[in-house]
């Protein structure tokens, strides 16, 4: 659990304890209790995106140190795959109605052959690399040119819930950032989320071509998004680079961006409710004093966040 998680959970629990004897705050206490539980269980989904055959699965396999993910031979077989650490290795295939089918870890190819039947799958692996990046959960995404239904399922699920995106541009196949690629990145940028662009398959290109592709991509991203990060160059053995990208993600800042606005809003709504109550209790001195004490404590918490 990160420091920010601990801090926000502690803040939420303190606010609940302070307000628990104030009847007018019962609804807000329930909301804050749910929010605190959400913070405790929050994962950081990091999708790896790009066109079909841009090297997403190969990159993740190299990071894991073994061939876990099948390399799709056609876009139709692609499905969003979450990779999670667990002592109990298994596959969970989740349908559109949230029902779950459980498979043996060795049945991944069979599950992917029925990709159209599922919304996404969760792959639980006893892999130390996945344990080391927790609470980050890597997601191997369908390519941009996957069937519309598969692509839309992935976008609907992971565009809102993904907190950081790793975007692969195949130097060998795509060579340039297309309008379609820009549209995909704009969906991330418009939500105020960050991405890291990587040019993959550079081992298949001469150095002069790599520099040209990188230069054009950098200019395009600067113009479209004000992108200032360096562009990573990936070959067929770049698992260590992916590991560095993941470990360089500022997860404390991510938790702050996700939850600080919600915690602050909840405390301010409590304050507003208390103000209304104080006005209504202006002739009941003791109740008003109690409400003021609660308000003072909540205001102090807002200030300290």
Q: Model segments located where?
A:
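Globular "head" domains of long coiled-coil molecular machines
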Residues: 7-10, 33, 37-261
């Amino acid at each position: 659990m990160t420091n920010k998680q601990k801090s926000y959970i502690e803040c939420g629990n303190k606010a609940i304890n302070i307000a628990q004897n104030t009847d007018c705050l019962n609804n807000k206490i329930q909301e804050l209790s749910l929010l605190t539980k959400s913070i405790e269980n929050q994962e950081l989904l990091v999708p790896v995106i790009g066109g079909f055959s841009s090297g997403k699965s190969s990159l993740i396999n190299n990071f894991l140190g073994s061939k876990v993910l099948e390399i799709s031979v056609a876009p139709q077989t692609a499905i969003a795959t979450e990779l999670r650490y667990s002592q109990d290795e298994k596959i969970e295939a989740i349908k559109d109605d949230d029902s779950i089918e459980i498979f043996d870890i060795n049945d991944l190819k069979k599950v992917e052959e029925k990709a159209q039947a599922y919304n996404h799958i969760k792959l639980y692996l006893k892999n130390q690399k996945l344990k080391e990046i927790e609470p980050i959960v890597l997601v191997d995404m369908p390519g941009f040119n996957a069937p519309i239904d598969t692509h839309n399922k992935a976008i609907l699920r992971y565009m809102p819930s993904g907190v950081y995106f790793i975007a692969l541009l195949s130097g060998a196949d795509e060579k340039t950032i297309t309008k379609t690629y820009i549209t995909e990145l704009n969906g991330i940028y418009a939500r105020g989320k960050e991405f890291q662009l990587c040019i993959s398959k550079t081992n298949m290109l001469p150095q002069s071509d790599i520099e040209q592709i990188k230069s054009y991509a950098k200019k395009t991203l600067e113009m479209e998004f004000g992108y200032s990060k360096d562009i990573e160059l990936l070959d067929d053995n770049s698992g260590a680079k992916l590991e560095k990208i993941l470990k360089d993600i500022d997860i404390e800042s991510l938790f702050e961006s996700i939850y600080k606005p919600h915690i602050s809003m909840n405390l301010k709504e409590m304050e507003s409710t208390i103000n209304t109550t104080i006005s209504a209790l202006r002739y009941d001195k003791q109740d008003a004093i109690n409400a003021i004490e609660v308000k003072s404590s909540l205001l102090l918490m807002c200030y300290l966040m």
